[in-house]
Amino acid sequence: NEEQTWERTIENILDLRPDNRLFEYTATIDLANKDIGNKYRDKVVYQYDLKQFMSDGYSKKVMLLEANQNDGDKMLDAVLLSQYRKLIAADNGITGFKPVILFKSNKIAISKAKQEEFSQLIAAMTPESVRRHLANKKVQLSSDTSIWHKVIQRYAGSDLVTVIGQIQEDFNDFNLLNVNKSDLLEENPVLLNTLEEVDNPVRAVFAVAKVNEGWDVLNLYDIVRISEQASSSKTGTDSEAQLIGRGARYFPFVYDGKQSFTRRFDNSAKDLSVLEQLHYHTINEPAYIKTLHASLEQADIDVHQDGAGIVEHARLK
């Protein structure tokens, strides 16, 4: 009954006094919808869309990493990129920086199996296996601006025995969280909702659907689709777009004694821009990518392709 709707109730309250006014705030108004557009055409006081919000630097910069890889290689990619961020933070005196990875599956059984596979992968890491993985990665790169060039260069100049020891400590079984257990929130509601705290050791989260709604974590930097199917379902990509939007929230870390709530390094020569980027690791399948981009566009999420930038060469005078 229309008389019982929230909208009708508000209108009735407004009509009680001629000087009543209503201010409405929303992040999801669909002005492209004809009915909604007609209703709000003369009522919008100020419009600040998500895409503009992201363009103005109030979010992480969302980067798509598309590759046809097996799950093991994809998980190792995410770990090496995540640890690269931590190394860059340490190089620049940024303390307590702990980037989190989300491994997203479509079935609980797969998520649990992949967590076990992940633990085995971390335990089996050696300097030789990392060098081999990065050498294969370098051969596959088709762009001079891919983040992987910097990642490969950083590890090439590092003591891999030490780095791998740090990775194995950071990603040990105690620092992995599987949120598919029905009793998780009763057991330990704190771990999932305090990932930004320095005393929370979790570096990787394995999930199916529990983090799609109402989960806000600012230090999520990598979202990895594992055992994904080459589906071009709009419903599925809409859900992914929503998750990407959540992961894009900016993490206001302190650098050079100053805390910022907007991006500072988009155009900087420093490697610090990676601390302001969310990487979404997914398959390189044309139909799926087309549908994903449509969902991201519909959600007003500004995305960039890894390696789509331009290499600038400065000329010395």
Region spans (language model):
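Helicase-associated low-complexity regulatory tails and linkers flanking the ATPase motor
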Residues: N1-Y25, D30-A204, L218-D222, E228-K317
